[in-house]
């Protein structure tokens, strides 16, 4: 009898854990933390503060998860009406708004205290501003106010490399802002691709994404132009001496792939082209930052 009781309890605990993990958008947070690691690694520190860096990643991750959970909370009504999001924890009834509010607040507070006390105040406040930028400025206002929502608010999601840099140095640096700029320029074509794929969803809930307000063809052209701009921006770390030929070759190859998908999206009538572009953009950013990391450490290894 005790085993029969224990099994449902264990299953229930796993479901609760899975529900709250989904609220934090773990795949998105993981990608953000990878870019933060790159920021930490490229920062010019003589004696790398490993423990401080570890606490930095935990704190940044907790606050990013908090922002994601707040996004779920604020968007729960429109999520319930969209095909892409109606199975999220709140619309599906797996949890309730009060629990999510408590959970997201707790994550944010713990993350902030951790960063402030064990890393440095600058990183704590910069991460807090990023949280506000995404959870409040973007989700509560810009998303519903302008088709340039993701362009303006993209800075919030682009901050992790800078946060990683400040976590180990305690200061802002122009090179860190270059890494931010890469993600900032990458963000619009990434989101506009999924917006094209889900344009009817956004139209149904009156969210003024670019393909809703300006049309799909205009959005396709914008994606292509942004990928060209991204290619140019990605060269800047080489020009300022941050990284070398390994990154340059990788960057040109990856951006050629992104431009190919954007060009194909512009010219192709295929229905799945937008989703293919969206998926490629994720692999593109991941590979780009891995290339930054590889170039940096290969340079250290082979430098006499």
UniProtKB/Swiss-Prot annotation:
InterPro entries: Protohaem_IX_farnesylTrfase, UbiA_prenyltransferase, UbiA_prenylTrfase_CS, UbiA_sf. Pfam families: UbiA. It is an enzyme of class 2 (transferase). The keyword ATP-binding does not apply. Pathway: Porphyrin-containing compound metabolism; heme O biosynthesis; heme O from protoheme: step 1/1. One of its GO terms (molecular function) is protoheme IX farnesyltransferase activity. Coiled coil: none annotated. Keywords: Cell inner membrane, Cell membrane, Heme biosynthesis, Membrane, Transferase, Transmembrane, Transmembrane helix. It is a multi-pass membrane protein. GO terms for cellular component: plasma membrane. Belongs to the UbiA prenyltransferase family. Protoheme IX farnesyltransferase subfamily. PANTHER family: 4-HYDROXYBENZOATE SOLANESYLTRANSFERASE (PTHR43448:SF7), PROTOHEME IX FARNESYLTRANSFERASE, MITOCHONDRIAL (PTHR43448). Converts heme B (protoheme IX) to heme O by substitution of the vinyl group on carbon 2 of heme B porphyrin ring with a hydroxyethyl farnesyl side group. This is Protoheme IX farnesyltransferase 2. It comes from Vibrio campbellii (strain ATCC BAA-1116).
